[in-house]
Amino acid sequence: DWSSDVCSSDLSFGFDKLNPEISNPKEIPVYGEVMTSRWAYEALAVTQFKNNEYEKIFYLYEKAMSQSDFKKNYWIRTLRNKLNAVERDINNKDKRKKVADDLFLIGNEIKKEMTHIKRIKFNSFEKLTVQKFDSTAFNEVTNYFDLVNEYYVRKYNIASAEKDKLISKYTTNDSAKKLFVLFKKQYYNDNLADFCRNSNEVERIVEYNGQLYQKIDPIFQDPDNKFLRAHFYSPRKQIFGVFIDTFWVNISIIWIMTIFLYITLYFKVLKRILDFLERMSEKLMNNKD
């Protein structure tokens, strides 16, 4: 199929990495957004991974497992390390800026997390400053991380158990197991999965502008932006806060770009712009003379 051809030909890549010097880890650079191939490839890749006959059975469980695994093994671990560094260096004048930055980041991340898990509260944001941070603040943040960790451990275990139940239904005997293996082999593309899950990414989590960003499993990660902008391989996108499947969003964008290009060509917009620039250039030259 097309996904095998694309993956084997090394044509798959992250449009968010077009120029790492001027892009950020959260979204695709604007100049990447105007490439029709970006919208077309992402639509096909996401749909082929998420909606193939095998993956669509397990996708929601794997999404919950992926999100939980990232939070408890990368996100919380990174924040705990920063919290411990803050406690260690809080009175070190040479590291005052680093401590302030870490406290700012911890506060940002807790605020973001509270929009996802509303029932786990943290009410001491005013203590997350170099001037007010103390042992009480340290314990309160630690307690918050403990509760969030417990939440994601439970979420992971529930999703994993449900997935295992489903697999058991399809593998009741040796014959069924063989058929299940063949079924997966027919529909699940390992190379495409590596791209959509960003499995080869060395940095699983990165820090940028006072926040932490997930770099693995983009296919299981929903974007925060309320209007269209998203990381590459996002399974769905938000339009005015409403989630819509990536396939339909991207197809709509391709149609809009096509219609825009048609109008541009039909009314010779590009020619008129070039003619205008040429006239302006001639006027400037004449004024100099």
Residue ranges and their predicted role:
Residues 1-8:
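Short, small-residue-biased leader/transition segments that mark boundaries at the very start
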Residues 280-289:
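Non-transmembrane, juxtamembrane loop and terminal tail segments
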Residues 9-279:
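Extracellular/luminal re-entrant pore-loop and selectivity-filter region at the outer mouth
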